[in-house]
Amino acid sequence: MLGRPKLVLASGSPRRLALLNQAGIEPDALRPADVDETPTKGELPRSCANRLARAKAEAALQSIQLDDDLRGAYLLAADTVVAVGRRILPKAELVDEASQCLRLLSGRNHRVYTAVCLVTPKGSFRQRLIETKVRFKRLSEEDIDGYVGSGEWRGKAGGYAVQGIAGSFVVKIVGSYTNIVGLPLYETVSLLGGEGFPIRFGWLNAS
């Protein structure tokens, strides 16, 4: 993509890629970062999201510095954490984890935190943390069993995907919807634009 600086997304998430594409921004490369996402003992949700986004950015930066085509590109990383109070919910991989998450979320408010970390071509780190409050309806055992059976939850923070079936569980959202999906679009695009990335480059003939 000639005519603009390159952009690397440090994620393999189809949702984050789709959100960037929705904003008319197409990364030149994906460099998913292999980072241990286990919270440290006593770690608070905000701190966890910030730490992991930075760790993903640093890991991906090492990778692109070895690539002549991508060295000096903008690098974007993000991490999403779902929490009830101070309790961080897992990125569910097991049926039991998903069931436990859903029971905990049932009929309650929870918060979704996404930390976005941008590395500029000059190597500066810029970071934003976005918080969204979400309320679920009271889930029946049939709701929980049916949703777990869908498999949609697998690998998702908090054991659900708001852009899928679980969207029907949501009573109220206060804040950014795209933040819950995994990348707060307004803040991400503002961050990129504020650091000199030509965010409107891909808008021409985007329809």
From Swiss-Prot:
The UniProt record lists the keyword Hydrolase: yes
Positions of the catalytic residues: 79
SUPFAM superfamilies xref list: ITPase-like
UniProt entry tagged with the keyword Cytoplasm: yes
Cofactor(s) it depends on: a divalent metal cation
InterPro entries assigned: ITPase-like_fam (IPR029001), Maf-like (IPR003697)
Cystine crosslinks: none
Enzyme class: hydrolase
Keyword annotations: Cytoplasm, Hydrolase, Nucleotide metabolism
Source domain of life: Bacteria
Catalytic activity of the protein: dTTP + H2O = dTMP + diphosphate + H(+); UTP + H2O = UMP + diphosphate + H(+)
Compartments it resides in: Cytoplasm
GO molecular function: dTTP diphosphatase activity; UTP diphosphatase activity
A Gene Ontology term for the protein's cellular component: cytoplasm
UniProt site positions, description: Important for substrate specificity: 15, 80, 163
One Pfam family this sequence matches: Maf
EC number, as in UniProt: 3.6.1.9
Family: Belongs to the Maf family. YhdE subfamily.
HAMAP family listed in its UniProt record: Maf (MF_00528)
Task of the protein: Nucleoside triphosphate pyrophosphatase that hydrolyzes dTTP and UTP. May have a dual role in cell division arrest and in preventing the incorporation of modified nucleotides into cellular nucleic acids.
NCBIfam families xref list: maf, PRK01441.1
Name of the protein in question: dTTP/UTP pyrophosphatase
The organism of origin for this protein: Rhodopseudomonas palustris (strain BisB5)
